[in-house]
UniProtKB/Swiss-Prot annotation:
One of its GO terms (molecular function) is carboxyl- or carbamoyltransferase activity. It is found in: Cytoplasm. This is Acetyl-coenzyme A carboxylase carboxyl transferase subunit beta. It catalyses: N(6)-carboxybiotinyl-L-lysyl-[protein] + acetyl-CoA = N(6)-biotinyl-L-lysyl-[protein] + malonyl-CoA. NCBIfam families: accD. It comes from Staphylococcus aureus (strain MSSA476). Acetyl-CoA carboxylase is a heterohexamer composed of biotin carboxyl carrier protein (AccB), biotin carboxylase (AccC) and two subunits each of ACCase subunit alpha (AccA) and ACCase subunit beta (AccD).
Length: 285
């Protein structure tokens, strides 16, 4: 037995040689749906306006992609592109976070504004981009939105605003909250001039944005399953000590309760806006 113990064969050692061929998929080629996890070609997904082929989930669009989808080619003129936030309250690390988001998104702030044409009809537009500070509303967002609204009022143009926001920007305190009233005043002047304001609420539209300019459109539209509300679901349940419906704060729930005029699939977004603008154009002739 001892002889066998000392004479047992040693296990052979093997060296694993990795295949020199690189099988990694280049970054950006594929996109995974955040809801159903299906992996799709990014190019094909973009051609479908970032709507998942499998579960129909509306994946976020960038501000410029949204504008491209609803406007005639080459018709968009951007306003106030270089406007950027200061740090009025000297909030720690605020400017560093702003700079980081600027590098990540290529934007100066969380809203893009300007004029464009849709089927030859000119309109003013503001599109929020939730990639930048979660679309939170600060002084620059309020100022840019007011400027484009005032331009539309002076030039008698309809105005379309796509909201996507987590609410007021806490780093700017009361200055951020002031934008709720400021934008509402500009919209009132636009309304008094007999002009059309279309509010298009996308996922998510919450907090101070939902409580101000996002909810006061002449026509309020939304995308399917968009989260729309003021306070969070958990906060409300704890406050009223009741269980809320499963579909609470969804676009469909708001439509059912009269707070939206229509829930529009993104593939029908351009056509729907064109039809509304044509009706307004005929009425105001």
């Amino acid at each position: 037995m001892f002889k066998d113990f000392f004479n047992r064969t040693k296990k052979k050692k093997y060296l694993t040689v990795q295949d020199s061929k690189n099988n990694d998929v280049p970054a950006g080629i594929m996109t995974k749906c955040p809801k159903c996890k299906k992996i799709m070609y990014t190019k094909e997904l973009a051609e479908n306006l970032n709507v998942c082929f499998n579960c129909d989930h509306h994946i976020a669009l960038t501000a410029y992609k949204r504008i491209e989808a609803i406007s005639d080619e080459g018709s968009f003129t951007e306003f106030d592109k270089g406007m950027t936030s200061a740090n009025p309250l000297d909030f720690p690390s605020y400017l560093e976070k702003i700079e980081k988001d600027q590098q990540k998104t290529g934007l100066k702030e969380a809203v893009v504004t300007g004029t464009a044409q849709l089927d030859g009809m000119k309109f003013g537009v503001a599109v929020m981009d939730s990639r930048f500070r979660m679309g939170s509303m600060g002084s620059v967002i309020g100022e840019k939105i007011c400027r484009i609204i005032d331009y539309c009022t002076e030039n008698r143009l309809p105005f379309i605003l796509f909201s996507a926001s987590g609410g007021a920007r806490m780093q700017e305190g009361i200055i951020s909250l002031m934008q709720m009233g400021k934008t509402s005043v500009s919209l009132k002047r636009h309304s008094d001039a007999g002009l059309l304001y279309i509010s298009y609420l996308t996922h998510p539209t919450t907090g101070g944005v939902s409580a101000s300019f996002a909810s006061v459109g002449d026509i309020n539209l939304s995308e399917p399953k968009a989260l729309i509300g003021f306070a969070g679901r958990r906060v409300i349940e704890q406050t009223i000590n009741e269980k809320l419906p499963d579909d609470f704060q969804t676009a469909e729930f708001l439509l059912e309760h009269g707070q939206l005029d229509k829930v529009v699939h993104r593939n029908n977004m351009r056509q729907t806006l064109s039809e509304i603008l044509k009706i307004h154009q005929e009425v105001t002739k």
